[in-house]
């Protein structure tokens, strides 16, 4: 039973199974990075299983193409599509690799997200400083989860974000764990549970 989805220029949007024939509006989790269609379907299926097991709220999952303007995509998606509760308390972000730069630009723009997960982030010292400044400027701080492979050559960057968040006394999670069979989404459920606890339905 495949999840209903909508393809736009820069994103693929999957609705919860409960959304069919419903007028209810749902929170939305944006995921940006190199994720093929097969991976998306696996992640959506895992997410729906978590919903069925009452581990998480039903939500819209929006997979945004890598290296596209995230702020613009969010604006387009939430204007064009129905069934989305577009507010900071209902919006979260998972960003992979060098897409953290698009993430930072979106975070800087306005109070967009209630929670942010950065996975194997690629960036420099400026990016780290910009991320901290951006989340610090929020009226309501979006909690951050930083996930990095222990052997990653970008370990220093994620570690730097962790240190800066700690120095700013901003509550966050920092994880450095090996992935199973090179699957970057090994800890997908952990990230969803973390964001679920931030979303206020």
Label every PLM stretch briefly.
Residues 95-100, 120:
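Catalytic nucleophile serine of serine hydrolases
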